[in-house]
Amino acid sequence: MSKISVNIKGFDSQEFPKGITPLQIMNDIKGVPKDTIICKVDGQLTDLSSNLNKNCELQFMDAKSKDGHSVLLHSTAHLMAQAVKRLFPKTKVTIGPFLENRFYYDFDVNSPFTEDDLLEVENEMIKISEENLEISHKVKSRNEALAFFEKIDESYKVEIINDLDKDETLKVYSQGEFTDLCRGPHVHSTGQIKHFKILSSSAAYWRGDEKNQTLQRVYGTSFQNSKDLKKYLQMLEEQKKRDHRKIGKELDLFFFDDEVGPGLPLWTPSGTVLIDELEALAKEKETANGYLRVRTPHLTKGDLFSKSGHLDHYMSSMFSPMDVDGIDYYMKPMNCPYHHKIFANTPKSYRDLPYRISEYGTCYRYEKSGELFGLMRVRSMQMNDGHIYCTAEQFKEEFINVCNLYMEYFKIFGIEKYEMRLSLHDPEGLGDKFIDNPTLWKKTEEDVRNALKGANLKFVESVGDAAFYGPKIDVQVWSSIGREFTLATNQVDFAIPERFDLSYIDKDGSAKTPLCIHRAPLGTHERFIGFLIEHFGGNFPLWLAPKQITILPVSDKFNDYAQQITTDLRTMGLRVSCDNRSEKIGSKIRDAEMQKINIMVIVGEKEVENKTVTVRRRFIKEQKEMSLNDFSDEILSEIKERRVSN
């Protein structure tokens, strides 16, 4: 039998019989961790049961690795689907992908799952795990796969297969009596899936389209050991407490109304304070960085978005046009084309560059009803948008300056963990998902990569996630409880300057095309405020808090003094309320803490006599008597510095 050479990461290169599987190699050599669940062959995730037929690089992986964990999650989704089919045989299975630390599977069932149903499913999953069923796969032709799933009456799988090319070859994975259509890879037995939990269920639409069949989506999670599972479940409990929808309602920050429409948030006075403070911060930072403020309309003729390429590449995320005098008008999904028009409105020379403009522009994007989620996925959003038009020589410095602006914001908000993700195009999507200009893609991506490296900024790369018009930096941040958010973006648009015939006069008198950087360091108000609510748990720092101070008279006879202090502090621009209810002071303090008011100012007989105030910080029992001037100086300084802790 012929031999192949296998270079195993962490081991010496060895020869094995052609056709051997990674699982067999695991059993042949000493030192491979027992908790290995998957492998990479020449950098590609591969089943342990796959045959190796040529010389290769082999790496064994456990579920602690990101790739290994994704495989474990995916395999647990199949385990859950098998349990559901055992308990509810008439159920139709659809799809079951993995997410970040979670998975889900969509089922077509006669009635929604109850809590008892889900507990029964979880118990059945434990039984299947204990059966330690081998998970194997076969490659089938499209017709073979179609015949198989038609025979077992899995109509959703049949629909998926019918949408594929006729010459497509498919994989099916089997474990015991259960077989699923899947690209894989998967763990090699159900016995490797031991530490899991069903989390919740909700309604979903087949293929995300509300016109299609309503399904039951069941979420779950899975980890390599019980310790990691427990830690994740504890984090989920903390997330529930900090859910921006829950806290937003408790603090009366925003709400949605059926008569207004889904995904269209209404901001209350308290929520509007958050918006105003963020805009003031952005204006301050952008002015310091040489940006000019602009304003643009909410709709436009379709011609503008045809020229920009949005109608070709972004139409599915735009609202339907409205007919005005026989012309199609669209609500804007982005501010970019308007900014290009502003740049082109007056002649520019090289002396005018870099030309930086910004605005908080309201955009409208169509999101399917099933994908809307509080402030995180909405249909109306206020975006911290801006564009920089510069020469090729200025590009690197301008791009890095935007990245540095992110760092300034993160420091202000106490965001300690973040990651820059360089999103690149996928060559297979040229002409469809991405503008068809491979030469420009290659050059622009390399320019961005070199700029990041030159500034010693750490980043990871993600193929296929670029904007249709150019590469971009997506900034991932983690809240104080460890949840990941996509927050900001810094994009290079190499197509727009030519599409809009943007130009400037260079030193030699010739017309040149500028480069365009599109940036949104704070993303949208909606998503960023949703993040901040969770990050701070609603306990906003003093400068940002909608309700900064409340004055608490200990009895009615001190109401006049309390009201005078309230008026004095308000004239200083502070957000102050006065609780002059006939309640005990302990009750007033508890109510103020429930409202997450930062500072309680207590006034009674002693304070009136001494012309002072007694100050109590949120959640701190210690109180301090101060003159009103000393108190106001202290808090105004804290607000000016935008301190995170208070």
Describe each model-derived feature in a short phrase:
Residues 1-94, 100-646:
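NTP/phosphate- and nucleic-acid-binding module
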